[in-house]
């Protein structure tokens, strides 16, 4: 179906994509963030991150382009697609590959298999919940393409404008590596914004075992990212707890946006010590 990745150009891949869409009468659906990869250099970069004979979960099969090349290298590819029309296309495109299992369904709702890698061009509108699910399922490695703005949030450090809940929760579980920026021209149809490819490797030890506590604490804190810790703690946990963390030399005058991961975990542990309920 597709030529060798080393011998195909972006124009070739675009033409193949257009022909497949025309053949099956499929129009890309903006609602589902359907932008199909047409850049062989991007595909090669993704393939280079995945060891041979890996077991892979792909979120968003599309017409099966990336799936096809992953199948040539992987031991097994589970690929999830919510759009029934694209399931029909991908089933035909990938019919000769016995190591590919196509699953029709919502990636947020179905059970995931145990895999070595997750690979996906993550739809913008479900990026955050998908990453949370990755963490909860213990996905050890991932290569994801996300909108540049989301990528900056994932990589952001304390004190920066992009720093927030998603930064903290993801960095608690994963070491995140920036691979490369990807322009709109690498997809069809071209999205309005650039993307970025990130590689995520599971930390040997998460910053905290109970992810729910981290979710609850960051939810409280980042409702008021520009307020002081003193103000937030007093409002939600009371003055007695405020006095306790002050006695522990916790910097209560710092702004929420400046709290690094270690400080947030410390605050959670103080809550546990004092039996403070995180709502």
Which stretches of residues belong to each language-model region?
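Catalytic cores of RNA-modifying enzymes
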Residues: 1-220, 257, 262-279
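Long, well-ordered amphipathic alpha-helical subdomains in the mid-to-C-terminal portions
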Residues: 190-193, 200, 210-250
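Interdomain hinge/lid region at the active-site interface
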Residues: 253
